[in-house]
Amino acid sequence: MTPTQKDGPRSNQDIRVPCVQLINDEGQHQGVVATQEALAMAAEVGLDLVEIVPNTEPPVCKIIDLGKLKYQTQKKAAEIRKKQKVIEIKEIKMRPNVDVHDYEVKLKAIHRFIGNGDKVKITLRFRGREMAHQDLGLKLLQRVKEDTSEIAKIEAEPKLEGRQMMMVIAPK
C-alpha cells in the first residue's frame, strides 16, 4: 500500500532521512543533527519540523509552525495572482470620414485605455465607395499614430484586411 501524496513540504514523521541540517525556531543554524533529535527539539517548543530544502545532502529542515507556513505560502500565491495584470486588447472603431469632435472623443478613449495598460486596436471600416479612398484611412491612422506617439508605440502597422484597415498600439 503506497502512502497518499501530501501537498506542501514534508514535515515531522514524513521526514525519513537519518540526519538533517537544522535551523531552529529563531532562525539560527544548528548544524547536522539526527532526525529523531530534531523532532524532539521541535516537540519541546510545540512546533513542527519542516523540510525546507529537500534536494541537498542532508536536507535542510526548520523548526516552524506548519499551519503558519502553509498560510503564508497561500497568502504569497494570492498576492502574486492579484498583482498579475491581464493585458487586454481594446478596440476603437472609426470610419475614414470621422468628424473632428468624434475623433477627439475616440482619442480620449485611446489615451484612457493606454493609461490603464491595455493595448488598443484601431479599426477603420470602409463602406461602398470609400474603398476607393484608402489613402484617407491611412492618413487618419497616421494622425492617430502621431497623436499617441508620446504614450504608445506601434505594435502592428496599419494594414488592410478586406474592407477594414487596422493598427494595434501598445503602452510604452
UniProtKB/Swiss-Prot annotation:
Similarity annotation: Belongs to the IF-3 family.
Its protein name is Translation initiation factor IF-3
Q: Which UniProt keywords apply?
A: Cytoplasm, Initiation factor, Protein biosynthesis
Q: What does this protein do?
A: IF-3 binds to the 30S ribosomal subunit and shifts the equilibrium between 70S ribosomes and their 50S and 30S subunits in favor of the free subunits, thus enhancing the availability of 30S subunits on which protein synthesis initiation begins.
- Enumerate the subcellular locations listed in this protein's record, separating them with semicolons: Cytoplasm
Q: How does it assemble?
A: Monomer.
Matches recorded under InterPro entries: T_IF-3_C_sf, T_IF-3_N_sf, Translation_initiation_fac_3, Translation_initiation_fac_3_C, Translation_initiation_fac_3_N
Q: Does the keyword Flavoprotein apply?
A: no
Report the GO molecular function annotations: ribosome binding; translation initiation factor activity
A single GO BP: ribosome disassembly
Q: Does the keyword Protein biosynthesis apply?
A: yes
Q: Name one GO cellular component term.
A: membrane
